[in-house]
């Protein structure tokens, strides 16, 4: 079973549809990453993320991929990023 974490990003200056697509595309870029429950509202982007078939995934594992993806796809400048269980 995939262990899923809550990801919350606070940012400004992004289009809601583009932010939704940005999150979904992250699941395509990282083939083993699962993304669900995407919610974009106001200046917040939230979703659940985990790695398929891995029950030993940590918050740091998700954060590392998220930071890498943020660097590769600069749709917005995050003000605050959190990953929690």
Language model features with spans:
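Short amphipathic alpha-helix segments
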Residues: 10-34, 66
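Generic cytosolic/nucleocytoplasmic N-terminal low-complexity/intrinsically disordered segments
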Residues: 2, 43, 64, 78-79
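Short glycine-/aliphatic-rich beta-strand segments at the starts of folded cytosolic domains
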Residues: 2-13, 45-47
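Conserved short beta-strand edge segments in small beta-sheet-based binding/regulatory domains
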Residues: 32-40, 68-85
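Short, intrinsically disordered low-complexity segments
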Residues: 31-67
């Amino acid at each position: 079973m995939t262990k899923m974490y809550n990801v919350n990003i606070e940012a400004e200056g992004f289009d809601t549809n583009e932010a939704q697509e940005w999150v979904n595309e992250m699941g395509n870029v990282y083939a083993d990453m699962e993304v669900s429950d995407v919610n974009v509202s106001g200046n917040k982007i939230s979703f659940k993320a985990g790695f398929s078939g891995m029950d030993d995934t940590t918050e740091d594992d998700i954060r590392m991929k998220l930071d890498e993806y943020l660097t590769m796809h600069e749709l917005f400048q995050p003000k605050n990023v959190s990953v929690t269980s």
